[in-house]
Amino acid sequence: FLSQYLRLQLFLSPMRKYLNYLLVITLISSCASEPESRNQVIETTSIITSTTSSSTSTTVQKVKEDISYDEFGIELLDVSPEMKEQFDELVKYVEKKTGLSFVEYPKFNLYTLDGYRDYNAASYLDDFDKDYEEGEWERAVLSENMWGLIESTPEKMKELIVEFQRCASAGSYNLLDQILRVPVEKNQKKLNLWEQSVIVHELVHSLQGQIVGLSDWYSTMKENDDFMDYPGRRSIMEAQADLVQGYWMAELDFDQRQDMTSQRPNFRCSVSLPAYFYIPFDLYYDFGGRLGKQIHTMERMEGLNKALFELPTAEQVYSPEKYFSKEPY
């Protein structure tokens, strides 16, 4: 029910040897900085009871502002008590619909839309420098040019992917730091319906992360340079998250759905990447969704919970009948 550019993405570290650079979407970690203080000059005027004179004095007061930032210096929005209550209710909703329980309260960061986009770009660039050895990116792009896959220079290709990071996501859950990140309106007491729908989706991923132990699982894959299990688990995870989000949206009445549509931010994303770049996303969100619906039809939510561990291969995601045959592929 969301277009390709609005698909809610479960971000991962860049894997330079996985699918020949098909997946270069990254979000790694977030932390809060110390609150900052600033000096504010306040002018005070004292009127002396006299017909001849008055005096003005200037005093300096230290005003403390409790503002938190992530590790890239991007502001994190405060969570009002009303938002926290909404978040608590959404946590309960996700637990009820999945039949699973959080081991610990999910971690989350709230940003403005611009702040969220800045975080996506900054975190990608941070990991890009760590993940690619000197000259490796240039050689990869040159190879793709030789095969006729792209016509971009290494620098232009990098710029396109960075912009894709900025604009293509409505919310995210990070496998490694286990933090849910969502852009919300600033200076509001309550989350609007659109924001809640995004949080429901990402809360499912947060729950999956705790139940499956995704952080350790992903770290082991990266250490062993073996990502064969990734497509199957990612597909099931997205299918389950889409399903629970769909449940939540289905409970809205007509007016609420109209409101939610009007609350959706402008996610314009005019970036055009090479066609092969989107192949994994078609696997996760399209074919994975089809497999997830079939599993749910046959075995309800218990079947999807089981599938988080009994992983399909990429071939079985494309051909669900092979998954249900229980034959090895």
Enumerate the language-model features and the residues they cover.
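Catalytic glutamate of the conserved HExxH
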Residues: 198, 202-210
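Short pre-active-site segment immediately N-terminal to the catalytic Zn-binding motif
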Residues: 181-200, 232
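Short helix/loop segments within enzyme catalytic domains
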Residues: 244-270, 296-310
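Post-HExxH zinc-binding segment in Zn-dependent metallohydrolases
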Residues: 211-215, 219-261
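Extracellular mucin-like PTS domains
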Residues: 41-59
